[in-house]
Amino acid sequence: MLSIANNCCISLAQNEWPLYKVAVVGTGRSGMAAARLLHSLGASIRIVDKTRENVSKTFMDWIKQTNCEVMFGEHCPKQFEDIDIVIPSPGVPLNLLKPHFLNTIQVLSETELAWYQLSNEKVIAITGTNGKTTIASLCAAMLVEQGISVFVGGNIGTPLSEYVLCKKKVSVVVLELSSFQLQTCSLFRPDIAICSNISINHLDYHRNMDEYISAKLNICKNQCESDLAILKPGMEALVDSYNLKARVVFYRDLGNFSTSRLLGVHNLENAEAAWLACKELGVTEEIAKKVVTTFEPLEHRLEQVRLLNGVLYVNDSKGTTVEALRAALESFKQPILLLAGGRFKGGDLTSLRPIIKKQVRIVGLFGNSREYFEDAWGDIIPITWDNTLEQAVKRLSNLAHNGEVILLAPATSSFDQYMNYIERGNDFKRIVHEVLNEHC
């Protein structure tokens, strides 16, 4: 028996699951994967969501086929009656659920549920406010190049439960994990944990910064002396305050990957973090350097879209935080015309005043959050504002000079005008490739 929360004991062993009734909250890909895995383990399942419209046809067909109990509607105590365990999908805030069920009910993440069903796979888990997808992708590429079989999943696309259900097994599982996924992890213990950085983010979901940091550090809280934690310099105090037991290594750019095609010092640091993890599992330095040299920058992450009339257009739509904006600005020596704006998530924009003054010639704002940027930088740099990204791109393209960079680095979420950062980045690329052709 293992204690996972609230001083209560739940066994996660396979043969114990028929004893439990589990509420799976949320019907996206993570919720569906958790439900399918629980069904295979013999648990009784109740699917909970606010509305039937959220459920895909595939999932609804599966629910009917398996006769799982379903409850739709606003969250209420009745949804959690007779429930032993709640598995919330990432993005479902716990503070919206907990008022509706007793403290004796255990909260478990889909990731932890699946992790406990693994066999002998080594696990590399990566989190951080910025950089985690690049590090996870680099880890996977290095391992594959070394001839080591890999599953890559978590926040990067495929829930771990889907891997557990498939018959093909691998040597190493690489997981990118968000604070949403980690917050409900109590036992999770990867062999290697990487935390790229922690800066203000998701305070619309977490109650405060302390809760956000605590969620992130769940990635290494349960590690012991035989495990490895790879952390960014500046996180030394957290090792003591959270009483981390793992071997701790702090990574930085050591110049090992100077031939990388990735823009920015932060990406060279990401390569170092990936290399430290993979070296632990037998990847040679030669292989690591080969991978980093040929590694293509990921979409929406300092993605060079087009060189038009001597102006380089760069898409960093994934950069939704103040620290991501800092890293993007530090990646260029050329003068920058900065595109920023959206739904502001918090952070100290005034901390960027020195680099804005040094590196940026004009700031082109679009969408919401105009006042945050104007208050922070309005006295040191020209700022324009347009309602849409397309209008802002057109304006800056008329103002740009040969040899300059027009950089989309919003420092905000996209939810004021777009479904997500991907839709925003794709719209930017459409504008650069299609609209500017007509505009020129």
From Swiss-Prot:
Pfam families registered for this protein in UniProt: FAD_binding_3, Mur_ligase_C, Mur_ligase_M, MurD-like_N
Protein name as catalogued: UDP-N-acetylmuramoylalanine--D-glutamate ligase
Domain of life per record: Bacteria
Reactions catalysed, as given in the entry: UDP-N-acetyl-alpha-D-muramoyl-L-alanine + D-glutamate + ATP = UDP-N-acetyl-alpha-D-muramoyl-L-alanyl-D-glutamate + ADP + phosphate + H(+)
Any single GO CC term annotated in Swiss-Prot or TrEMBL for this entry: cytoplasm
Pathway info: Cell wall biogenesis; peptidoglycan biosynthesis
Positions with a binding annotation for ATP: 128-134
EC category name: ligase
InterPro entries (alphabetical): FAD-bd, Mur-like_cat_sf, Mur_ligase_C, Mur_ligase_C_dom_sf, Mur_ligase_cen, MurD
Species in which this protein is naturally found: Lawsonia intracellularis (strain PHE/MN1-00)
Functional summary from the UniProt entry: Cell wall formation. Catalyzes the addition of glutamate to the nucleotide precursor UDP-N-acetylmuramoyl-L-alanine (UMA).
Keywords (A to Z) from UniProt: ATP-binding, Cell cycle, Cell division, Cell shape, Cell wall biogenesis/degradation, Cytoplasm, Ligase, Nucleotide-binding, Peptidoglycan synthesis
GO molecular function annotation: ATP binding; FAD binding; UDP-N-acetylmuramoylalanine-D-glutamate ligase activity
Broad class of the protein's primary localization: cytoplasm
EC number(s) reported in the record: 6.3.2.9
Intracellular or extracellular location(s): Cytoplasm
Gene Ontology biological process terms from the UniProt entry: cell division; cell wall organization; peptidoglycan biosynthetic process; regulation of cell shape
Protein family (similarity comment): Belongs to the MurCDEF family.
Disulfide bridge map: none
